[in-house]
Amino acid sequence: MDEELQLKNWTELHNHIKSVLDRLDESRINESFQELLEVNVIRGRGILASEVVREERVVRQGAVLGALVELFEDYIPELGIMVSREALLLFLKSFRGGRTKYCYGLLALLCQLCNSDVMHEIGLLQLADLLLEVPRDRAVGMLCFMLGQAGAHLMNVCRTAHDQLLARLTDMLHDGKLSPTSSNRIQELLRLRRSNYKGQATKFSLPDHGVCTHRVTLELDIPARLEPDSSLGKFYVDNQFFDTEERFAALRRQALERFLGQQQQQAEPVKDMTNAEEVQYKKQIYLILKGSLTGDEAAHKLLKLRPDASQKATIVEIVVKACAQEQTYTKFYGILAERLCGSHRNWPTSFTNLFRDLYGTLHEFEPNQLRNMGKFWGHMLAADHIGLNLFECVHLSEHRTTPSSRVFLKFIFQELVADLGIAEVRKRLEDENAQPLVQGLFPKEGNADTVFAINYFTAIGLGVLTESMRTSLPTQAKSDSGNMSPNGQTLSYPSSRVPRRTRSRSPPRTRVRGDSPQRARVEQRYSRYDPGPAHRDRRRSRLSVTPPPRRNIH
């Protein structure tokens, strides 16, 4: 076949491979594999390898590309060698050139190839040694990322080298010469190691396939061999064009028969719409809470479950709702929440997220539940396990609060004052760092919301906390800030004392039925108040009342 026709075929091959990879994502790995088999990937393996390691593509989905290369291992093993070697060389070049994002994408690709046994682990260990030679923050971050993605695989196949890498990172952490960001990354990696890297490696749903492990290494002593292959993906004339077509036809038939046969054998997965696992997990958490004598015991049992991020959110929700269902608030739940927040930094985040979710649905809770939850959150704030960023979702105004939310906030602040004292609470709220977090709770614009907030805190007995808000009011409003409505009108609050009813001078009416001695005595007693018909006529005409003559009683 002449060169011009081969070049046209090459261009069509390149465009097809590029379009398939552009549409690639985690849900289309198997479909992309079938679409690539529509063209001669034996001839285009160089194009496929060069497109896989392209910077803009690797940065976005390095691990997904590694899974796609893994599927071709049983049919075109040369592709795994080309991609592994090119990714190693490009990482070395990009790291020296300071292209950090590209380095992280290549690391994700290499870790996926190593986890699936396409590439031998010696390549990753060489990269780890190179990163440790320059213990800068950038190198430490990449090394922690690599161990987070492939640490479980390295621990299984080369435990000694894996432990040595962790020991080096631990020594660097203890030296104290790293930035806080790098120190936090190392600490997070050590926590992952204690959990045996649970849930860290990316797993894809792939059909059964064979794998051939390639021992690809960097020849560091020969600088000329450390440059990426510039001819990868370039056009070349295939002198055995038709033989290559026959080989690909046989390969494609074998691959599709195996691939489609497995899809037919696989039954349609049953999706559990009853959430039975979630219900069972919640039941287990509830039984732990009810079967524990102290909050410390409950926290110990819950932490032994080693929950992930989503399970932590479930546990936090059950703890708060179980506290709300109690007859009265008990410190059991407060101590439990303290122990959970002190064990890992993700727990306070889960509690904060739950507070924001519950605050919008407070109208669904009963008054007793509002009291228990308010005291719970007040206890957590007083214990300083949750910050004042809890109040970022609170806007204290007449139109943005409900009676339920006002009652809820009242119990929070009353619990805070009971635990810390009014002086300490005021000190925390007036701190400069806390002002942006509580500006919705203590508005200082000098408008109706400010007046409403002042009246609210004054009504619940915490008017001391409103001193900073009163300074933002106009002069006339300052004098009436305790008795002003949100519309600016002066409010007259009734006294807490109920005034006594004025006693009437007229005698009480006594109803006596029938003729009896009692009726005679009553008429005789009240006869002095009836001056007679003549006097009544004079009173109507003169509009004056002449009191009856008093009788002298000796």
UniProtKB/Swiss-Prot annotation:
Domain spans labelled MIF4G: 14-196
Biased composition (Polar residues): 473-493
Gene3D superfamilies documented for this protein: 1.25.40.180
Segments of skewed composition (Basic and acidic residues): 512-528
Pfam families with a match to the protein in the record: MA3
A GO molecular function held by the record: RNA binding
Residue ranges of the region described as Disordered: 473-554
Keywords from the named record: Cytoplasm, mRNA processing, mRNA splicing, Nucleus, Spliceosome
GO cellular component entries: catalytic step 2 spliceosome; cytoplasm; Prp19 complex; U2-type spliceosomal complex
Subcellular location: Cytoplasm; Nucleus
InterPro entries: ARM-type_fold, CWC22_splicing_factor, Initiation_fac_eIF4g_MI
Taxonomic superkingdom: Eukaryota
Domain (MI): residue spans on this chain: 280-396
Residue stretches of biased makeup (Basic residues): 498-511
Family listed: Belongs to the CWC22 family.
PANTHER family named among the record's database cross-references: CELL CYCLE CONTROL PROTEIN CWF22-RELATED, PRE-MRNA-SPLICING FACTOR CWC22 HOMOLOG
Summary of subunit composition and partner proteins: Associated with the spliceosome.
Name of the protein: Pre-mRNA-splicing factor CWC22
Species the sequence originates in: Eremothecium gossypii (strain ATCC 10895 / CBS 109.51 / FGSC 9923 / NRRL Y-1056) (Yeast)
